[in-house]
């Protein structure tokens, strides 16, 4: 990452086929926050929603969770995420960092459950909190690099 990328907003995504969790954070501070969930089943609808978020937040870069199997091998969603990352980078002309997202949804679900958030409300928030965990992992990795 260049010196120019030490400040600015970051938007992170936990990509799903129906819902995509979104988190935000500031590079200088390194703390991630859940932001919203995009309800969209098509890539075009998802990109339109991201277009609005990007216009509002003016991100310096994007972080995208890279789903893999438990052993780290790739699956169909890995390919979907890689294609989505290329599309993001092309459309917004911002770098996209891919971050291992193994267990983020399960961890997010556990954290929400521990706070007494269950059912449909939990399902909606799980993706945004998973995006937060992905982004926080990105920030934490920058500190140890």
UniProtKB/Swiss-Prot annotation:
EC number of the protein: 3.1.-.-
Pfam families in alphabetical order? RuvX (PF03652)
EC class (word): hydrolase
Location relative to the cell: Cytoplasm
Classification via InterPro entries: RNaseH-like_sf (IPR012337), YqgF (IPR005227), YqgF/RNaseH-like_dom (IPR006641), YqgF/RNaseH-like_dom_sf (IPR037027)
> Keywords of this protein's UniProt record, alphabetized?
Cytoplasm, Hydrolase, Nuclease, Ribosome biogenesis
Molecular function as annotated in GO:
nuclease activity
Query: Belongs to which family?
Result: Belongs to the YqgF nuclease family.
From its record, what is one biological process in GO terms? rRNA 5'-end processing
PANTHER family per record: POLYNUCLEOTIDYL TRANSFERASE, RIBONUCLEASE H-LIKE SUPERFAMILY PROTEIN
| Protein name stated in the entry | Putative pre-16S rRNA nuclease
Question: Might you report a single GO cellular component term?
Answer: cytosol
Q: What does this protein do?
A: Could be a nuclease involved in processing of the 5'-end of pre-16S rRNA.
Superkingdom, natural source: Bacteria
Show the Gene3D superfamilies listed in the entry: YqgF/RNase H-like domain
**Entry's SUPFAM superfamilies?**
Ribonuclease H-like
Species: Thiobacillus denitrificans (strain ATCC 25259 / T1)
Q: Which CDD domains match?
A: YqgF (cd16964)
